[in-house]
Amino acid sequence: MSNDLLADLDRRMDRLRHRAKRAAEVLRGSAVEVTEYEPQAHGPLVSFDGLDGYEEVDRYWVNAPYAFVYIGYDGANDEHRYHVVEPGLDDFEQDLLETLYDDIRDALIYDAVYEPEDPESVLKEQMKQLLEEYGVEIGMNAFYRLFYYLHRAFEGFEKLDPLMQDPYIEDVSCDGYGVPLFVYHAEYTDVETNVSYEQEELDGFVVRLAQQSGRHISIGDPVTETTLPDGSRAELALGEEVTPRGSAFTIRKYSEDPFTPARLVDLNTFDLDQMAYLWLAIESNKSLLFAGGTASGKTTSMNAVSMFIPPRSKVLTIEDTRELSLYHENWLSSVTREAIGEGDDITMYDLLRSALRHRPEYIVVGEVRGEEAMTLFQAMNTGHTTYSTMHADSVQTVINRLENDPINVPRAMIQSLDILCVQTLTHVGTKRVRRNRVIAEIEGIDQRTGDLDYSTAFEWQAADDSFSQRDSVVLDDIREERGWSRSELLRELRNRKRVLHYLTQQNVEDYRQFTALINEYYANPERVVERVKAELDEDVVVDAPGVAE
């Protein structure tokens, strides 16, 4: 008899023994009374005494009362450690968890169409019924520790769930089998965690992430990029064909509450003068491009300044993976799609061509990398206001990328771009920060040399972490288009700066509140300015070289 047949026979016998044991348990029965978890009555679900060799610098809940994060600091090696603390289980509870998981999973597979409104209550009821069938009596402390792991498995991201729940984490990276995950933490930057995956577990998890987001991944097609159900971006690799250390993934977490311009000012990514300038430029239909390296904040900034788009304007966004979140009523969002069955891929180029038929006033493209850039600049040249991002570390690099393969935008068409913001992820002291390094203005083609001319309107000064401002061609263009005098232009900038200063001073980080005041300003600027002036601790000064009263 072959080994395969013997293994199959063993599996069948195990199932028969399992069913017989289950039948005996059902006949015996038990009664489980489930009550709400109360820390004083039931005791803590999780505890932790710290890590040897590490000084505790932070501890906070990510899923109270089940899981918290411990941040330790190793002074000898000058490094932090991110340690996830979850409920402990003894051997009996671990076996019970596996049995519950199998039975609940089977029920979910059988009833896959059913989506309960309150999955937590349904899960608790399923656990109660199964425990009664098993004849197992457990206390509420053990019940809720088991509940945590089951809920994490069926409704969350399994062992990755605490990291996905942590609001301070921006990126999560898994580099292979048995390798600790690394996270990019808003406070402690790149940190090693105590979370890792073995081969079978990691392969299954990568496949699950792909399937949950409607993508296919296999050994024959081992790499895919996708958007997870919660909106996070994920780059997935399966097996060892393209990633020799094993399956891997990188997740760029999605924030349900996007950064506002006030938040970017508070972080000193931009200053008030830059943000007032961008507000007026966006209102005046100037096209913008945000450039920078990986994790420099390009998309975050573009998403933030889109809150300045006038409320009734039609906005259309085009993305490979869903990142943009506009609080705008007249907004049409579109995302690329891989071919399904015999259908064709729907690319950014296809979506951009289609977008022009929707007659949008503002077109926002997640990132330009190829042929869609030509259509984007054609849209600019035909009067559409467009915003996008690009990977590049300087103004000249942006121009070089646009003019050469694979993008190949003619120099004459690049003239239609008005403003170029270049962002960077850098250090100020011991902290890693994001700064808008330069705001450049495209002035046109030099008739003498044939080169594309640009000037710098704002520039970050690394020495004192401040921003300097120079003359602005864009502001002069806006003044002429609006028929304003220089003093009227200065007043418009000052009023916008007052509103932004007020929003920053009031710590208005909720994008709904921020957008509400911006929209109110568009409806009645005088009323908003008077209210803001009355509530400000001090008035603002507009530093606008070349714009004198």
Where does each model-flagged region fall?
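Switch/coupling sub-region of P-loop NTPases
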Residues: 277, 282-291, 302-427
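Walker A (P-loop) phosphate-binding loop of P-loop NTPases
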Residues: 295
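Active-site phosphate-binding and catalytic loops of NTP-dependent enzymes
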Residues: 155-165, 210-225, 313, 407-410, ...
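P-loop NTP-binding catalytic core
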Residues: 174-287
